Amino acid sequence: MAIQAAEISQILKDQIKSFGQDAQVAEVGRVLSVGDGIARVYGLDNVQAGEMVEFPGGIQGMALNLEADNVGVVIFGSDRDIKEGDTVKRTNSIVDVPAGNELLGRVVDGLGNPLDGKGPINASERRVADSKAPGIIPRKSVHEPMATGLKAIDAMIPVGRGQRELIIGDRQTGKTAVALDTILNQKSYNDAAGDDENKKLYCIYVAVGQKRSTVAQLVKKLEETGAIEYSIVVAATASDPAPMQFLAPYAATAMAEFFRDNGRHALIVYDDLSKQAVSYRQMSLLLRRPPGREAYPGDVFYLHSRLLERSSKLNEDNGGGSLTALPVIETQGGDVSAFIPTNVISITDGQIFLETELFFQGIRPAVNTGLSVSRVGSSAQTKAMSSVAGPVKLSLAQYREMAAFAQFGSDLDASTQRLLARGARLTELMKQPQYSPLTNAEIVTMIFAGTNGFLDEIKVSDVGRFEEGLLNHMRSNKKDVLDWITNEDPKIKGDAADKLKAAIEEFAADFA
């Protein structure tokens, strides 16, 4: 069979034409050394600070130290499968995470990967984890209340939408309980808002360095109460690598900023930032960065300030959205003057102080109302609340002062005895069981009863019973009064005070 030369040349031409030129160019480097979750990589000359890089087997890392001859990369995952000589690829993207409504009701890790077994998350967008905080011009003063449902906080240390309020205390003082109650309290408000996105508050809870069992318990509680529908849980637990614990708060803030930037409202709880600082210290020391006070690196203040500055209230031109932050800090032996606590106190707009002593006395939430402060929240209080809350702060401050002196002498004049009696009852009134947040109107009613002498003749041990009875009476017989406080937000004085007084008197007359 004769082979035609023309045919051969035609076949070759066709082959050349159909040759696929899908060559992929990737900038790669080699691992020089690896250990303790840190890899030293040679050859990634153009890598950016904070860029995501990829190791064999899909393990990801983040370039943090850009040095003259190598790059220090922190590894998001186990470093056991990475060895010297492995190739490392650039991804050309700064670390980003998924964001959007699709994340609501889900539990994810610090990179936005699902942990709850409910399938993949097809998020509408991705956001850079460590983005820049809004400037001065787009912001607005905090003026809308963010109700926690806790009497002691809503009355005396009010938090507004867009505020950063620190929750600080020793271990086992109920810090997470305060934050969790705040998330649960939003359910009634979100249900009442219906489709009005402007009134809803979405919640993001970040667990940093906690036990998995604790996080599982919290998620279970959110599911039982139905609060998971408007919440996102970001978990970087104690068994996760330090880089994941460092990244989780930034990633969660990026998810929360989706709501803020779309004219909606979000609340983010960082539980807790002490553990984030510890994991950042670990990474920095392993990267051979010079240590400073308490062996923390020099930029540990910036670590928290750039995170918390992203929580803000935006003005109407920028959508009017807000992001409220409740960072949690754990102190050692009540030492508030340690490095991290002082840093975060100076960054935030106030702090809620929880004390071990109060906790063991049975005063829960164990809020020290003398040391706790809200620097911007008073302008966000409802009119009804601010008109009844003033006398409480004063009465409790005087009570604390007098109680110290009263221990020394027994012959006290009548006015001092009255002050001590009322202070003891108000302190009792501020107690509240966990998972039972109250509405704004219910708190106003209870505090009004306390400051207007309705508790003065009742035994301290009966205050809880009186409160329970009064709340049931108001909910079943005087719902119109509660609705009036909620909808009209009147200043409780003059006729308004008389109306509320009459409703309480109706119950107090029959209480025994």
UniProtKB/Swiss-Prot annotation:
Cellular component, GO annotation: plasma membrane; proton-transporting ATP synthase complex
Source species, domain of life: Bacteria
Subcellular location: Cell inner membrane
Coiled coil (UniProt feature): none
Main location: membrane
UniProt: ATP binding residues: 169-176
Role: Produces ATP from ADP in the presence of a proton gradient across the membrane. The alpha chain is a regulatory subunit.
Full protein name: ATP synthase subunit alpha
Species of origin: Jannaschia sp. (strain CCS1)
Gene name as annotated: atpA
